[in-house]
From Swiss-Prot:
Membrane spanning stretches: none
PANTHER family found in the cross-reference section: RIBULOSE BISPHOSPHATE CARBOXYLASE, RIBULOSE BISPHOSPHATE CARBOXYLASE LARGE CHAIN
Subunit structure: Heterohexadecamer of 8 large chains and 8 small chains.
Organism this protein belongs to: Euonymus maackii (Maack's spindle tree)
The keyword Cytoplasm is assigned to this record: no
GO BP term (any one): photorespiration
Enzyme class: lyase
Main location: plastid
Protein known as: Ribulose bisphosphate carboxylase large chain
Modified residues (N6,N6,N6-trimethyllysine): 14
Localization: Plastid, Chloroplast
Amino acid sequence: MSPQTETKAMVGFKAGVKDYKLTYYTPDYETKDTDILAAFRVTPQPGVPPEEAGAAVA
């Protein structure tokens, strides 16, 4: 039999899902000549925040 080993999670890693709105907004972003603007119309299902529905497209 092989010896058992213990696996530990990396330091700083927490399981779970972060709200997308916490990570997508970058107020200091400067546009570039190569940036492309795309627009999507998203209608969230009942009970789904608009930001999270938009994250599914992003």
